[in-house]
Swiss-Prot record:
Pathway: Cell wall biogenesis; peptidoglycan biosynthesis
NCBIfam families (UniProt xref): D_ala_D_alaTIGR, PRK01372.1
Catalytic activity: 2 D-alanine + ATP = D-alanyl-D-alanine + ADP + phosphate + H(+)
Domain ATP-grasp, residue spans: 106-305
Biological function: Cell wall formation.
Family: Belongs to the D-alanine--D-alanine ligase family.
Binding-site residues, ATP: 136-191
Keyword Transferase on entry: no
UniProt protein name: D-alanine--D-alanine ligase
Keyword terms, alphabetized: ATP-binding, Cell shape, Cell wall biogenesis/degradation, Cytoplasm, Ligase, Magnesium, Manganese, Metal-binding, Nucleotide-binding, Peptidoglycan synthesis
Amino acid sequence: MKKTLKQEKIAVLLGGTSAEREVSLDSGQAVLNALLSAGFDAHPIDPKTFPVATLKEQGFDRVFNILHGRGGEDGTMQGLLEQIGIPYTGCGVMTSALTMDKMRTKMLWKAFGLPVAEMEIVTKANVGELNPSAVVEKLGLPVMVKPSLEGSSVGLTKVKRVEDLKSAVDFALKYDDTVLIEEWLSGAEFTVPVLDNEVLPSIRIVPEGEFYDYEAKYISDNTQYFCPSGLSAEREDELKQLVKQAYDVVGCRGWSRIDVMLDGNDAFRLVEVNTNPGMTSHSLFPKSAATVGYSFEQLVVKILELSAE
C-alpha cells in the first residue's frame, strides 16, 4: 500500500549555509506552519546541523525544499536527494544547477531566440584585460554589474560613469569568479510565478531606490508591489507566453518564479529564474497566487503535491 501524503513524514529543508540563510529560515517557518495546520507530519530540518544524507534512515518520505541560494538551490541538494531516493519539491538537478548561473541561463535562452539583456562577461582570469571604454561603447551607460552566481542581489552595482566600471567589477568578483556587465534595462520590473505549468499573474516591482537589491527585497517597507501589475491584457498575455517558454527551455518543474524587465523600447527581456522562491509573509509568489484564489496554506500543499507527480 502506497502511503498518502498525509501519512508520509515530511522534511522541510530550511536555513542552510548560503548567504540567504536568514530568508530561508523565514520561508521555512512559514511553510512548516502551513503544512502543520493542513494536517501534515512535517518537521524542520536545517542542513547546517542535520546530516541530510540520513533522512531516509530517519524515516522521512519526502522533502519540501525551501533552501535559498548555494547548497540548496544549485543542484547539489537535489543530487543528494536523488541519490538517497527521496522525492522533493521543485526543480531537478540540471535545472537547479543551470539557473543558479545567470550567465549560462541567459546564453541558453538566447540560443533559443528568447530576449535577454546585452552583456559582457568578465572573469577573475581575464579582468586584467577589461577595457571599460570598449564595454561602454557596446552597452552604453549606465550598466549593471553583478556576480553570475550569488542570489538575493548581493554584489550589484549600477555604474553611471566609465571610470567607476573597474571598481564595480572588482567588487562583484569578491562574490563570484564570473561577473556580468549588462546593458541597463530602464523599464519596469516584473516577477512572474509559474505553478504546475500555469503562469500566474505578474507582479510589478517598484523599488524605492534605483534597483531591487537585498535591502529592497527583504528589509525595506518602501518597495511597492502591484498585482495585477497594470499591464494591458494583451501585454500580460505576451509576458505569460514568454515566461512559459523560458520556464520550459531551462526545464523547470513544480514551481519557479521568473524575473523579467522592460528595456528602453518597451520590449520584455528575461532576467533570471528563482527555482525556490521566497515564501515569507511578504513574498511575491504567494501574493500572486492569492489573486487567483490560493490561500498560503493551499499554495504550500499544492507545491508539495506536485513533488508526487
